[in-house]
Curated annotation (Swiss-Prot):
Record GO terms (molecular function): chitin binding
Glycan attachment points: N30, N63, N89, N151, N184, N265, N281, N290, N306, N319
Chief site of localization: membrane
Subcellular location: Cell membrane
Organism the protein comes from: Oryza sativa subsp. japonica (Rice)
Record membrane topology: Single-pass membrane protein
Ranges for domain LysM: 111-158, 175-219
GO CC, any one term: plasma membrane
One of the GO BP terms on file: defense response
Biological function: Chitin elicitor-binding protein involved in the perception and transduction of chitin oligosaccharide elicitor signal for defense responses.
UniProt PTM comment: N-glycosylated.
Name used for this protein in its record: Chitin elicitor-binding protein
Subunit structure: Forms homooligomer. Interacts with CERK1. Binds to chitin oligosaccharide elicitor. Interacts with LYP4 and LYP6.
């Protein structure tokens, strides 16, 4: 390997290289997956582009997503061109499919990186992939016995960290986040709408004051509730956080998420070759709502099947917005309180009668 030969040209350079490799952590992150092995879901990393580039180049570099899904993951307009510029040092969410195996989550056989002249595994891990992965993890994933021996044009699977675990029983999308200079867990949690205690527990952090720059955190982002069936091929892939959108069912369905409702909003895309979308109860089109307030129902996307031909499924969904759920919970709690007060009052009356 040319880079290794150059590095070992002098004893001093060889010693420096050895120190760098020994100092590198064996694991960039410890993302656990408690779900069944083989489970897949949507995850992402928050990538910082070291140089000026374009969205099209990022799609090609990571090869884990399409341009429409990359734009959706970052809340950018649908019509944004692949040539649109990405400034140096700006951050972009890169979505990918996560697969859980043996209590560990890693990107599902992608991205694939082709070794270039002068490349080394540590440089690939740090400079190309923001140190979301270590050279040891790349070597292990590709069955490379000697990390110093890789060849130009060799293809490498880069195992990015991820998870498909739920958080307190709710679906989330796990974002791999690299801690910036001077950042703390409280500010990071507030930025992404999670509690600091959740962030600390998820990342097994006992002392938040010891957070280090470049440390990789698992940030479980809240996602919109959906009506997608567990039997649908995309039931774990449409995990959309606030302000994002995505395409599914052969790009025939577009779904978006907003924190105003936290309820997945899906509409049909009028693409050539897309099948007709069934009405709900014979009257409501996909995305249409009947009624108002917490008693309203919406024709929701519930998945697709594609055994012989693409079939899109819909179903009626009740209003599951946060406001309505809180209202229902509040009313139930109020009713229980009133019942308790009635029982207490009744017993007080009996006690008073006994003393008369």
């Amino acid at each position: 390997m040319a880079s290794l030969t150059a590095a070992l040209a002098t004893p001093a350079a060889a010693a420096l290289l050895l120190l760098v490799l020994l100092a590198a952590p064996a694991s960039a992150a410890n993302f656990t997956c408690a779900v069944a092995s083989g489970t897949t879901c949507k995850s992402a990393i928050l990538y910082t582009s070291p140089n000026a580039t374009t969205y099209g180049n990022l799609v090609a570099r990571f090869n884990t997503t399409t341009l429409p899904d990359l734009l959706g993951a970052n809340g950018l307009p649908d019509g944004t061109l692949s040539s649109a510029p990405v400034a140096a040092n700006s951050t972009v969410k890169i979505p990918f499919r996560c697969r859980c195996n043996g209590d560990v989550g890693q990107s599902d056989r992608l991205p694939i990186y082709v070794v270039q002249p002068q490349d080394g595994l540590d440089a690939i891990a740090r400079n190309v992939f923001n140190a979301f992965v270590t050279y040891q993890e790349i070597a292990a994933a590709n069955n490379i016995p000697d990390p110093n021996k890789i060849n130009v044009s060799q293809t490498l699977w880069i195992p990015l960290p991820c998870s498909c675990d739920k958080e307190e029983g709710s679906n989330v999308m796990h974002l791999a986040y690299s801690v910036g200079k001077g950042e703390n867990t409280s500010a990071i949690a507030a930025k992404y709408g999670v509690t600091e205690s959740t962030l600390l527990t998820r990342n097994k952090i006992d002392d938040p004051t010891k957070l280090q720059m470049g440390q990789i955190l698992d940030v479980p982002l809240p996602v919109c509730r959906s009506s997608i069936s567990d039997t649908s091929a995309d039931h774990n892939l449409m995990l959309l956080p606030d302000g994002t959108y995505g395409f599914t069912a052969g790009n025939c369905i577009r779904c978006s998420c907003s924190s105003t409702t936290y309820q997945l909003n899906c509409t049909a895309v009028q693409n050539k070759g897309c099948p007709s979308v069934p009405l709900c109860n014979g009257t409501l089109k996909l995305g249409e709502t009947n009624g108002t307030g917490c008693g309203s129902t919406t024709c929701a996307y519930s998945g697709y099947s594609n055994s012989s031909s693409l079939i899109i499924q819909t179903s009626l969904a009740t209003n599951q917005t946060t406001a309505c759920q809180r209202g229902g919970s509040g009313r139930s709690q109020f009713a229980r309180s009133m019942w308790s007060m009635s029982v207490i009052s009744f017993h007080m009356v009996l006690i008073i009668i006994c003393f008369l």
